[in-house]
């Protein structure tokens, strides 16, 4: 996506306009003391927590890709006590470690006390035989005999065509008939036109899409949400903070929100925006520390939808924020590994932070600390990352621009005169 088109999307005045009620709203049930609010699944007695625990960004051990089990276990305990008993993992998450973690840490709880969601990695499937092998592997890793919610993972036009060719839906429906899947849906990264085709193809139990107040028009999330709502398909939301971006707004936007609600986090505004949509069943959050979890529990306990005045406040904050954002990366890391080792999401995070804070010194120091093979200049424009990017970012073009900016800043002595707070340095 070109930056011009990106900013044009942000400028759309309807970005925060309330969506029409195209179908019956999910019924919210009163929260018990210390627990998050819940919503009913369609017209059944099944209730699910409005907050779901995403397992793509679990805490890691220092200087290691390994999951910090001690910290994660403590967070799971806290979540379960607060009624946050929906856990979302996937075959690829955290280098394949996420499903193992789910099995290792959740198996101590009674199986009927929590909901477990995982996904068939359509991109990894080559033949129909792979379906059985991968599904059984997932059950083993998660130490379970069934998944409460299961998805075709990250569908787009090509993934959907492949799924039809290999009979993925039919295979998973057999697993559902065997009791190994309770609810079958899909997660999605493409245009509303493709979503219309997929949503119309089968009687899906739910769908997982990217929704947040930044992408409501930018990523055409509103159109996607309305398609699913018209078809009475409950929505599970991913990327409500857009990869953490909406939790770290620039000072101007943050000030607007804090003036309106002192003591409330930027993240709480983003979660309330998503939770205010009537057909949203669960909002996922990839929490990496106890502070994130505690703040989210506070937001979703006795949940209240945004008022018209609060929507106007959020609109004003978005207007202030849009001036500083450079690259619409959510840090999903689907672009990795880069064949030549470029640290794509890390570079984008550095650059966006610099644009938001104006601290060129922090950017040049952190970018310059990367190995040369990890910098944008090492990109060979093979295009592998572009095909994998759910945001459709022209990654080679952005890397080239960022590397040019870095070299230009490095030549300027002013870049090194800025104060560099420790928290803005990237390790």
Where are the regions that the model predicts?
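Structured C-terminal cap/extension of enzyme domains
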Residues: 223-427
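Active-site mouth loops of central-metabolism enzymes
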Residues: 57-69, 120-129, 256-260
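Conserved beta-strand positions
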Residues: 53, 89, 118, 149-152, ...
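Structural motif corresponding to the early beta-alpha repeats
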Residues: 93, 108-132, 153
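Conserved, mostly hydrophobic/aromatic
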Residues: 41, 53, 87, 102, ...
